[in-house]
């Protein structure tokens, strides 16, 4: 019986690891769309806003403001509407975790 419990626990941990790996890969796919303007992993070229290492909460607020139309923009209000609030939160966390 102990072996079954250990086997189930190992299986759950394995599935959690696979799920987390798939989630970070999905976030990287979303972040790749940002690279056109903000550079790879948020390291922008001169003249564009870098996202790497920015405060997560401030970045999320800015994204939500773009999405709602509170913050004027040429493209970001359209781009941000293509993501759920949760996806925007995950993107903000991803870029905040990148080294400047």
Language model features: what each stretch is:
Residues 1-8:
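Bacterial N-terminal signal peptides that target proteins for export
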Residues 9-12, 35:
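Short N-terminal leader segment in a subset of presequences, especially plant chloroplast
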Residues 11, 68, 81-100:
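C-terminal capping alpha-helices of c-type cytochrome domains
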Residues 14-31, 47-49, 60, 65, ...:
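Electrostatic cytochrome c docking/interface patches
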Residues 27, 41-71, 77-83:
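Gly/Gly-Pro-rich "capping" loops immediately C-terminal to redox-active cysteine motifs
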Residues 32-40, 91:
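The canonical Cys-X-X-Cys-His
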């Amino acid at each position: 019986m102990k072996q079954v419990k250990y086997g189930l626990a190992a299986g759950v941990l394995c599935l959690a690891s696979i799920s987390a790996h798939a989630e970070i890969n999905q976030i990287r796919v979303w972040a790749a769309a940002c690279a056109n303007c903000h550079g790879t992993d948020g390291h922008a070229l001169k003249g564009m806003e870098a996202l790497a290492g920015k405060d997560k909460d401030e970045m999320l607020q800015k994204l939500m403001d773009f999405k709602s139309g509170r913050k004027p923009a040429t493209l970001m209000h359209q781009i941000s509407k293509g993501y759920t609030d949760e996806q925007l939160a995950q993107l903000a966390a991803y870029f905040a975790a990148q080294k400047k």
